[in-house]
Structures are given as C-alpha cells and as structure tokens.
C-alpha cells in the first residue's frame, strides 16, 4: 500500500520546546502556533514510510514476553531494525520479521531507513495469561436456543483457521491443550453481563470441546467466557468478552438490482446497530455492504430498478441501520429498505418528502430501560432546516418541533434566521439535543450555535448555557459521550470542540503544541470519523487515516503513530469483543477480499505516545462494585455502592458523585480513610433510597408519579488524565414499577395443569349482588390454573411469592386482600379484628363498597385508600369481633368456607400495602372446597321407600301369578290330560 507521512514523538517534543522559546521571546501565540504547524506539515511531508506490529492473537491483552511480535515496515528505504538488547529479532534486515522480548518492560523499537522514522515504545508485560477461549455458535430455531462450542487455544501454536476465527473444530494442538486443561479441573462457563446469569457446560466431548446451551436473547447480549483458575505450564486463560444475540437477518439482493453508493470520491460511510456493533452497513463509492459478523462475511445492498435514477443511486448522503430495516437519505429524501419493500417515505409516514438533512439514532445501548414500553419510544430522529421529526419502530414519524416554535421559546424575533444543524440523543434515553444555527444579521461570516434539549418525559424544551461562534460555511456534527452528565464532543471539518460537566466547561480541543486545527497536522485532510467508547476513549480519524486521540473530560488531543497509509480507504469500528479495529476496503481486489478487518492496539499505541509526553495517572487504582448499567428501585428498596481510590500521599484526591435527570432519591455517604507505605486509600459507601411515605395520603397516585423517574449517576476520581485506563462507572437508576415483577400464590401453577375447562353454577343466594337467576360460570384452566382442592373444614392461608424475569425473589410480607371475581360472598376468615390487634374498626369489603359506590370491585379497595386499624387517630370505634379481612404472611389469618356444601371459588389477590411497590401487583388462584353431603328431605326419603316397597310387592305378586300360570301349564294340566286313543291297522 502507498505510504503516508508521519512525524515522530521526538520531533514533537522539540517543537513544543521551540514553541515555548518563541513565546518567551515575545512572539505572539498565534504566530508561534503557525510556525509549529508549518514545521509539522514539513515533517509529515518528508517522512515517507510507516511501520506496524502484530501478534498472532486478535486480543492484545495478552501482549507479553511469550508473544511473537510481527514487525512490518511499509516503504522503500528500509535498512534494518533497531531493537534493545533484551529483545531478539529473527532477521534485522527484513522489512517483515518476528520479534521476541524475554524481559518485561518498555522496549523502544525503531526501523533504520533512508529517512528518520518514528520509534515506538512497546510495553511488554510478564503476564501469566497466555491462552485464549475459542467458540462457535449454532442457532437452534425450533426452541430459540444457541449451542456454543468452546475450547482453549494457544495463539503461538494454533492453526491459521483459529487465528482468523474461521475454525469449526479445534486443531490438534488445541485439542490436546483443552483435554489437558480439563484434566486439571478447567470448566468454562458463560456469564451474561447485564442479567448476571451463568450457563455451565456438560462434560468434555471426544473432540476436545465443551458444549453450552443457552437461550437466544435480545436484551442480554454482552457475555463473558470465564473458567476456573487453572494453569498449565504457568499459563492461565484470558476471559473472553463478546456479543451474542439472536440471529440478525441479512437481506439478500435479487439479480438485477442496481448499486447504491456515496458520491464518487467520498470517504466511506459506516452505520451499525446501537447495541450490536457486529451488525453494520458500509457504503462506498462502488457498492454498499451489510454484515452481521463485523465483516467476516457480507452481502451487497442494492436498490431495485426503477425507483432511483442513476444520479440518485450515486448520491447517498446518510444511512442508518436497524434490525427492522435500513433508512437511506438520497438528495433530501428518505427511503426505507426492508425485507418486503424499498420505498420512499413521505407525508403519509409523517415526514417531509424533500429537504431532509440527516437522521440519527441512539449511540449508547440501554437495553434494559428501552425495552420497557419499547413501542412508545422513538428509535431515531430526522431533521430538515426547519423541522425535527421523531421516528418510531414502524418507521412512522411525528413532528417534535419546528424553528417557528423554537423562536418563540427562545424569545427571538421572527425576522432572525434559525436553522437546525443536527440532532442527537443524549445518554439519557428519553432526551435529545438539537443543535441550532442562529444569526440576526446573516451578512456576517459567523453564526452563533445554540443547544436546546428536549425531554420526552416532561415534553419540555430547555435552552442550555452554551454558545459557540463558527464560520458560516462550517458543517457541525456532535456526539454525547458515555457520561451521566451531558458531555459533548463536536467537530467540523478541521476542529474538535468540547462541552463537559453539564455545559460548564466549553472550548476547542488542542494538541500539546497548542494547535487547534487538526487538518494542519494531517496534511490538510478533513475529519472523517469520530469514534467513542464506554471507557472514555475518543478516536478522531482524518480522511487520510491520520488519527488523533482524546480522552473524555480531557481538553487535549495527541496524534497517534501512523498505522495506515494515506490512500487506503478505511473506517474504524468495534468488533464482537468490543475492541477497536480498522476495516479496509479495496475495490481492486477480488470480491471476497475487498473488505478486510484488522485489530488496532489502541492501548499499546497510547502507552507508546505517553512515554514521550510524560503524562501519568494521578491515582494507582479506582475500584467499585457497579457491575450493571441499569438498576431498578421499587418502594422500600435501596442500592448500596462501594467505591475506593488509591493514590500517592498528599495528592488529596477524592471520589465525586454526579447525577443528572429526575431527583427522586436521597443518598448518604460513609467515608473511610487509610494511609500506609506512602499511599492513601479512600473508601466511600453510598446508599441510595427513598423516604416518601405513601400511607394515609389523599393524592396517592399523584405522589407516586412525582417520586418516579430515571436518575443518571456516575462515580469518578476528582483528578484524572489521559493515561488512566479505568473508566468512570456510569449507570442509571429507574425508580418506579418494574414491569417484569409479578406475584403468585405458592402451590398454584398455570402451565402444568392437566384438567380441562368445565362449567359450574353458583346459586344466586350466594352472590354479593342480587340476581334473578343462578350464575353459570365457565372455568378457563389456561387463565385460572388448576384449582386447589381442600377437604371438609380445611382452611387456607395464601403464601404470596414475588418473582421477576429471573425467577423467585422473596416471599411477600406485606398486607394483601382478596375477593371472589364472580361475586361469591359465602366465605369468611378465621380471626377477628380484635385478635389481630385492631384498636379501631378495620376496613372490610362491605364498608369499602359502601364508601365507594358505583366503582368496579377491582378499584374499590387498594393501596390508594388503605387505612390501618392500629391507631386511635385513624378510623373509628366499632365492633372488633368482625372477621379481619386483611391477610399477610405473619398474621395467620386464614380463609374459611361453609362445610354444608361444596363450592368453586376463583380469587383475585392484591397487595394492599401502599409502601410496598409502585406496581399494582395482583394474581388469580382458585379453590375447590369439599363440603358435607347435604341431608335429604324426610318426605323424599319416605316417598322413595314407599315406591321401592310398592315396586317390590308388585314384583312379588306378579311373580306369584306368573309362577301359578307356569305350574298349571306344565305340571297340573299334563297330569289330568287323558291319553290319546291308538288307531287299529
């Protein structure tokens, strides 16, 4: 590949010294920066080559003294490699060779060539983690499960297929290694990051693999393969983080479809799914490609003939990919491509047919929150110069606002010019920011940039304390960083701007030399991509593949060592293990080789850069127990966060807690401080909770609404730098009803009932309401489950259990009530109000129905109007000998049924305690009570006996006469009959 220019860190330090000398000599800051920029440009033009390094594994976390480091020089002036004595190279005069460093430490590697080349400082660890996990996945559709086959491999002896992740079974060396690890007690398991579930394998197969079966999942996709702490030849296995979701469908294009591309000469355009970065789409000036495995395989994306003209097909301006379909922006018009259609979106879908400038979607995956009422949440935002649209899962849009309304909100004259530049979602899942361009007299060459934030919770717009002046022709884009606070990175073609700490720290990103124009440091190239991750890394890629690095909350950018030449067509993206990689596109190669991915060792490159810059992290360790991005908090619950920072003595660091969103919680903090061996350790325990009491309030539902919401929090050290590798933990606490929670009565199950539906009749005298006829009821087994059959006189106390999507949580210890859903009233309770400790008369169904006439029985009594009977100040005196109709786990109150007859009862149970849950927790169960056989009527018995006796006597009389007839016919008459006379012959 053609080569690119590269300045070296030694030159950078010299230029920094030169700039300081110029400033001390009285030269203006602007002139000093111009001199330095000119020298940087000259250096980049004069250096004509680059070099890279690789290891056998795609995972650079095992970069150690055991690794075979492949060195590769790209250029024509190579002479030899300059390496330290602690390392050995196979061939010092070969541009491609292998390096081995047997001693841990920072090793300076440099090629000797015709021009002065850049040197890298490679950090080689003496790690005991040498082996890696390998896995394959088979999707099983009939039961929606996935079969994961796992084995161990050593990158230094693995097969080529294993190294490029195309192997279907282990190689011989991997099979032997896996069996040896199994003998030593190794057993892998898959751990899901979000729901924290664990899946274990069966025994090792004859092929030397473990097999794990797990269900397909769309909301728990981040997984880790872990194992026991087992070593072989002093080497352990590294944990493998990866994404595994339900199969993402790739739409194949029928023959005859036509290419859909970006304009000729445009840089590559990339879009990936918010939660599944392996599901992506790449648009080039030749073709558009789609993948579901980070471009290990791909298909072409084309347009059906007759919909777009030739010019339109080569005018793709923006693209956004979803599982439901893909949206293309062509000449201001949005087109939707799904499995069934390729169609233009217009006013019938709620969006303008022309004039659309762009669209965006959420950049951060917040599955657990977004899956709550997902159909009611927007999935993308589109905009024109004057209008902002919100798009939903059906790809229908609604208008959020327009510039006329925004002018009124901002109190701007209608004669001012206000245009929408861009729109982005915040890290807060229900907020979006609109970037506005404003000018009163637009004849000047500058314009003011404003930001307003829309809250979907309150449906309000808020103007932020942010203002930026840019040239009129500047095209501005922006992203919200992975932060609880609305931290922003913005960029035009040449500069990067920042806004940190809720718009209180605003400015322009500069390099250590003070330069803010990144194009001047990259041969005049424009900004192509800005990639952000959850750790706070921000990579700015220029069109000529020069890359800069910015750390979140840091206002300085550093230029990274050149990795790719200036003419290669590339984009940066994340692979299935959430690591940064580079995707190359070369239209001149065979079709199956046109796209190639290459891991990029970002951390190693940063360590090499920081060696010359002298940057260091102010703390040694920052730890916490925040293992999830999403926490749910119900009434009576609390969340305890443990965090700890270790730093050199006298630095005075501390842990900062920042929050954003609804202020619906209170928290307390407990600090512990320790000094030992010149280091300070601060431990902070933070407890989040609510103090609101919902009992005895008149506005129960309104009070609940005021105390529910989403609160975003982050814990961070008070000081940090570019070299701090630990990320600030960011999480959200959703206070409110958890839709996955439900209750069940112990012993009842709807799914394993073998009975069939049946009908029964309830006597009208047994109903709460008066009816003219008996009530016939159809018992639906699927709805009510199997009824529990109770013997004569047996009482029953329901034990209520609380569950969520992961199974049983606990036994409910709160008060609850129940009622028969068909209106039966022929049951009671075994304890009285007095026996349960009541001072005043307790609430009953009869009293609540009397207080709330014309209200459905389900709403007559509940947590909204519950009043306890254990205080003189609440309620009124009355008959305490009445049955107590409130139950709980500890009061031993039981349900009683009449013993004189049998009956079928279908009950609905409701949690009554107003301080137990934001959810309306109810369940249904059925009881079949077996009563005594009722005594028959005396007259009926006498009549029955009379009939039986009459029948018996009648039979006797008839049998007597029948016997006489037979006796006379066959005995008497033959004896008295004269013999017949014989005839004579």
Swiss-Prot record:
InterPro entries according to UniProt: CATSPERD/E, CATSPERD/E_C, CATSPERE_b-prop, CATSPERE_Ig-like, CATSPERE_NTD1, CATSPERE_NTD2
Tissue: Testis-specific.
Cellular component, GO, one term: CatSper complex
Membrane-spanning segments: 938-958
Name of one Pfam family that matches: CATSPERD-E_C
Regions of this protein lying in the Extracellular compartment: 36-937
Disulphide-bridged cysteine pairs: 87-101, 130-235, 275-365, 439-442, 617-724, 737-919, 753-786, 838-869
Keywords: Cell membrane, Cell projection, Cilium, Disulfide bond, Flagellum, Glycoprotein, Membrane, Signal, Transmembrane, Transmembrane helix
Signal peptide: 1-35
Membrane topology designation: Single-pass type I membrane protein
Annotated family: Belongs to the CATSPERD family.
Subunit structure: Component of the CatSper complex or CatSpermasome composed of the core pore-forming members CATSPER1, CATSPER2, CATSPER3 and CATSPER4 as well as auxiliary members CATSPERB, CATSPERG2, CATSPERD, CATSPERE, CATSPERZ, C2CD6/CATSPERT, SLCO6C1, TMEM249, TMEM262 and EFCAB9. HSPA1 may be an additional auxiliary complex member. The core complex members CATSPER1, CATSPER2, CATSPER3 and CATSPER4 form a heterotetrameric channel.
Function: Auxiliary component of the CatSper complex, a complex involved in sperm cell hyperactivation. Sperm cell hyperactivation is needed for sperm motility which is essential late in the preparation of sperm for fertilization.
Protein name, entry field: Cation channel sperm-associated auxiliary subunit epsilon
Name of the gene encoding the protein in the UniProt record: Catspere
């Amino acid at each position: 590949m053609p080569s690119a220019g590269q300045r070296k860190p030694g030159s950078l330090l010299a230029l920094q010294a030169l700039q300081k000398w110029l400033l001390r000599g009285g030269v203006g800051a602007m002139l000093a920066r111009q001199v330095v920029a000119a020298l940087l440009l000259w250096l980049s033009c004069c250096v004509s080559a680059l070099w890279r390094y690789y290891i056998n594994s795609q995972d650079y976390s095992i970069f150690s003294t055991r690794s075979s480091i492949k060195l590769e020089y790209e250029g024509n002036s190579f002479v030899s490699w300059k390496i330290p004595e602690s390392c050995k190279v196979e061939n010092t005069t070969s541009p491609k060779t292998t390096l081995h460093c047997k001693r841990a430490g920072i090793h300076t590697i440099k090629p000797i060539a015709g021009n002065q080349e850049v040197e890298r400082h490679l950090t080689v660890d003496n790690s005991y983690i040498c082996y890696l996990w390998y896995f394959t996945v088979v999707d099983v559709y009939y039961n929606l499960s996935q079969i994961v086959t796992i084995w161990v491999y050593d990158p230094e002896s693995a097969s080529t297929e294993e190294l490029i992740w195309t192997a279907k079974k282990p190689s011989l060396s991997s099979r032997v290694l896996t069996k040896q690890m199994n003998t030593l007690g190794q057993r892998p398991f898959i751990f899901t990051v979000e729901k924290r579930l664990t899946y274990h394998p069966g025994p090792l197969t004859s092929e030397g693999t473990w097999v794990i079966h797990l269900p397909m999942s769309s909301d728990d996709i981040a997984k880790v393969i872990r194992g026991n702490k087992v070593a072989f030849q002093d080497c352990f296995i590294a944990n493998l983080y990866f994404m595994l979701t339900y199969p993402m469908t790739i739409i194949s294009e029928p023959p005859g479809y036509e290419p859909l591309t970006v304009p000729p000469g445009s840089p590559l355009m990339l879009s990936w799914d918010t939660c599944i970065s392996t599901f992506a789409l790449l648009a080039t000036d030749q073709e558009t490609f789609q993948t579901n495995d980070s471009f290990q395989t791909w298909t072409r994306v084309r347009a059906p003939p007759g919909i777009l003209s030739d010019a339109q097909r080569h005018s793709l301006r923006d693209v956004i990919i979803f599982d439901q379909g893909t949206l293309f922006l062509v000449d201001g018009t949005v087109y939707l491509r799904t499995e069934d259609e390729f169609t233009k979106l217009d006013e019938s879908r709620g969006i303008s047919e022309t004039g659309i400038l762009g669209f965006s979607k959420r950049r951060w995956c917040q599955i657990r929150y977004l899956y709550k009422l997902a159909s009611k949440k927007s999935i993308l935002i589109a905009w024109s110069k004057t209008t902002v649209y919100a798009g939903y899962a059906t790809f229908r849009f609604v208008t959020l606002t327009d510039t006329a309304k925004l002018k009124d909100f901002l109190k701007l004259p209608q004669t001012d010019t206000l245009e929408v530049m861009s729109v982005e979602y915040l890290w807060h899942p229900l907020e979006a920011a609109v970037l506005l361009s404003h000018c009163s007299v637009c004849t000047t060459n500058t314009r003011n940039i404003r930001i307003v934030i829309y809250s979907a919770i309150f449906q309000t717009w808020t103007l932020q304390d942010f203002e930026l002046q840019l040239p009129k022709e500047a095209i501005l884009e922006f992203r919200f960083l992975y932060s609880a606070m609305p931290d922003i990175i913005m960029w035009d073609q040449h500069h990067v701007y920042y806004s940190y700490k809720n718009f209180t720290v605003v400015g322009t990103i500069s390099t250590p030399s003070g330069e803010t124009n990144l194009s001047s440091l990259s041969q005049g190239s424009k900004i192509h991509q800005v990639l952000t991750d959850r750790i706070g890394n921000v990579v700015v890629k220029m069109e000529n593949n020069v890359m800069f690095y910015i750390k979140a909350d840091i206002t300085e950018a550093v230029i990274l060592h050149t990795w790719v030449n200036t003419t290669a067509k590339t984009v940066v993206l994340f692979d299935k293990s959430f690591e940064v990689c580079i995707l190359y596109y070369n239209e001149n190669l065979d079709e199956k080789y046109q796209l190639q991915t290459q891991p990029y060792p970002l951390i190693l490159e940063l360590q090499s850069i920081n060696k010359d810059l002298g940057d260091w992290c102010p703390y040694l360790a920052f730890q916490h127990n925040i293992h999830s991005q999403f926490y749910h908090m119900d009434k009576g619950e609390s969340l305890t966060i443990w965090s700890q920072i270790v730093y050199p003595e006298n630095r005075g660091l501390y842990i900062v807690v920042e929050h954003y969103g609804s202020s619906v919680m209170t928290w307390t903090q407990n600090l512990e401080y320790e000094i030992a061996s010149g280091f300070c350790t601060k431990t902070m325990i933070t407890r989040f909770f609510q103090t609101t009491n919902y009992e005895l309030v008149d506005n129960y539902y309104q009070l609940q609404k005021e105390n529910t919401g989403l609160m975003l929090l982050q814990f961070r050290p008070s000081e940090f730098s570019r070299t701090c590798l630990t990320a600030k933990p960011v999480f959200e606490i959703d206070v409110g009803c958890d839709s996955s929670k439900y209750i069940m009565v112990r012993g009842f199950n709807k799914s394993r009932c073998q009975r069939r539906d049946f009908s029964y009749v309830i006597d009208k005298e047994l109903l709460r309401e008066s009816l003219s006829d008996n009530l016939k009821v159809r018992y639906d087994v699927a709805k009510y489950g199997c009824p529990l059959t109770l013997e004569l006189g047996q009482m029953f106390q329901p034990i209520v259990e609380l569950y969520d999507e992961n199974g049983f949580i606990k036994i409910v210890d709160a008060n609850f009530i129940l009622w028969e859903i068909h209106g039966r009233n022929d049951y009671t309770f075994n304890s009285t109000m007095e026996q349960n400790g009541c001072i005043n008369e307790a609430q009953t169904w009869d009293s609540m129905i009397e207080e709330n006439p014309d209200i459905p029985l389900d709403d007559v009594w509940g947590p909204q109007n519950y009043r306890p009977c254990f205080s003189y100040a609440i309620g009124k005196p009355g008959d305490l000998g009445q049955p107590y109709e409130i139950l709980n786990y500890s009061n031993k109150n039981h349900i009683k049924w009449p013993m004189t007859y049998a009956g079928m009862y279908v009950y609905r149970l409701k949690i009554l305690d107003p301080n137990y849950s934001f959810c309306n927790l109810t369940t249904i169960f059925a009881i079949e009570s077996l009563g005594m056989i009722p005594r028959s009527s005396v007259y009926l018995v006498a009549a029955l006996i009379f009939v039986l006796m009459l029948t018996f006597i009648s039979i006797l009389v008839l049998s007597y006469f029948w016997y006489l007839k037979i006796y006379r016919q066959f005995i008497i008459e033959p004896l008295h009959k004269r013999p017949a006379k014989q005839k004579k012959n």
